[in-house]
Amino acid sequence: MASNSTREKLIALAHKFCSIISSGDMEAVLALRTESCLTYQCCPSFSTRPLNNQETREYFEEWKHIGWNSKFWIIDEGTMVVDEAAKKIAFRAACSADTIGGPYENENLVILQATDDCALVDGIWEFFDAVRKQDLMNRLAAKQAAKGLDSWCANTHSGDDKGVPANNESKVAA
């Protein structure tokens, strides 16, 4: 039985990456990454910086207080770009979620750097629509202002009020 080609492994890794992100299972998200994996949210207008695995965990913990029913999927497998020699795959993705600021949808271009065996992700670059992201941030800030909140309020929520971010820093998952 022949083993899967590098191309097939990279495509499978991309699908697994999206499925795990959608699952919301943080342990599975981190298990798919190498210990040194960095996530780059590539949007200069948000002045983002790379996130290591611990920061990624914190990022998603914050997100769980303002967003739920998050989904992340590949839009069109036919537009994937696979670099077998470099062990990289690029693909268009979409995301959606319900948030305390209302529905959120965005499109992303994702590049994954895989390990030599294509089993784990060693680097992530996410490019997203900054206008849609800023719209969400504005809605979250308005919700926050209406509540008189000035910080992440995960520990001060009640009922369906899941808290909102303190400012327009790009901490909300793309």
UniProtKB/Swiss-Prot annotation:
<keyword id="KW-0413">Isomerase</keyword>
<dbReference type="InterPro" id="IPR050977">
    <property type="entry name" value="Fungal_Meroterpenoid_Isomerase"/>
</dbReference>
<comment type="subunit">
    <text>Homodimer.</text>
</comment>
<dbReference type="GO" id="GO:0016853">
    <property type="term" value="F:isomerase activity"/>
</dbReference>
<comment type="function">
    <text>Isomerase; part of the gene cluster that mediates the biosynthesis of paraherquonin, a meroterpenoid with a unique, highly congested hexacyclic molecular architecture. The first step of the pathway is the synthesis of 3,5-dimethylorsellinic acid (DMOA) by the polyketide synthase prhL.</text>
</comment>
<comment type="pathway">
    <text>Secondary metabolite biosynthesis; terpenoid biosynthesis.</text>
</comment>
<protein>
    <recommendedName>
        <fullName>Isomerase prhC</fullName>
        <ecNumber>5.-.-.-</ecNumber>
    </recommendedName>
</protein>
<comment type="similarity">
    <text>Belongs to the trt14 isomerase family.</text>
</comment>
<dbReference type="GO" id="GO:0140874">
    <property type="term" value="P:paraherquonin biosynthetic process"/>
</dbReference>
